[in-house]
Amino acid sequence: MSSNAINLYIGNHNAASITDFIEFLSIEANDAGMRPIITHQLFQDTKNIVIECFNKDLNKNIKKLFSKHDPRLALVATEIVKDGMLNSTEPGKDEKQEGWYNTRSKYWLKRSKCFFDIVDYFGTIICVSEEIFYSIKALNLEANVIYWPPRFYGNLECFYENWRSKNIETLKSHEFLYSGSLTSYRMSQLETLLAAEVTLLSIKQDSPDVVRQRLSMQTGLTLGPKHYKNTRQLSKMRVLWCLNNMYPFVMERCSAATDLDNFCLFYDDVEELIDIAQDIGTVYPKSIENNHAFAMATKNLPSVLLPIL
């Protein structure tokens, strides 16, 4: 294989659910002078990027092909590690866990066990948020642990015209768009909105990107409630997708600060969403300026993949 090839391994995921990772990592690879390929295989003669989600068969294959702290393996860490578990949502002890992020479920117990079984084989670990970075660094692994700073990957040419054509000059069917796993905490917010006669469109979290794009254009704002009331970390990939695709959004404020906070529109309680829904257009001027400020601040950042060359 070409000496500057880099393999984006997707065999451990539903491809539709990681479209943003595939797109952004491909651009990062190109910007680092690499040629990305996307496969369901791991290769010994090139570098491989694996997005976290391990199982026994994948771990067995990695151990067969590679050695510990292997420079050919880079892991994209997508979850906070806490008390020996992958636990990004950090529900409070008094909260009922349900939906996708139930840390007591067999799925997360197995996924966490497989993570710790294989993490030492990676020479580089790329963390998609500050809180993930801090939690991985605390494990004192021999891998090179690096933070992936958010970037704008789009085109600044005709930025304002393109933003308006997507969000203002389009027919709106609903005020808010929501996609993601449902918990009692999230459901209580959605039910309050519906009771106030706010229109809400909900889609599956693994909907194809073309559907997500189309529905984002026909709704007023993408909605980002926390999983649980104690969830500490902003859903940064949701924010990054919206900023790069130039769609307005509103996120529930989390306690942990991030480098995206200055580019976000936040809410603290559902009553604020009801007020916003009365006239979605009033938040558009702030949304477009936030989006443009993000693009200007991050457009020329170096590729996160340069350290693994």
Language model features: what each stretch is:
Residues 63-65, 277-280:
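Short amphipathic alpha-helix with an adjacent loop that forms part of the alpha/beta core around
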Residues 2-46, 52-71, 75-265, 297:
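Nucleotide-sugar donor-binding catalytic core of glycosyltransferases
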Residues 271, 281-309:
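A charged, aromatic-enriched C-terminal amphipathic alpha-helix characteristic of glycosyltransferases
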Residues 236-239, 270, 274:
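Short amphipathic alpha-helical surface patches that serve as generic macromolecular interface elements
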Residues 262-271, 278-282:
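Conserved acidic donor-binding segment of nucleotide-sugar-dependent glycosyltransferases
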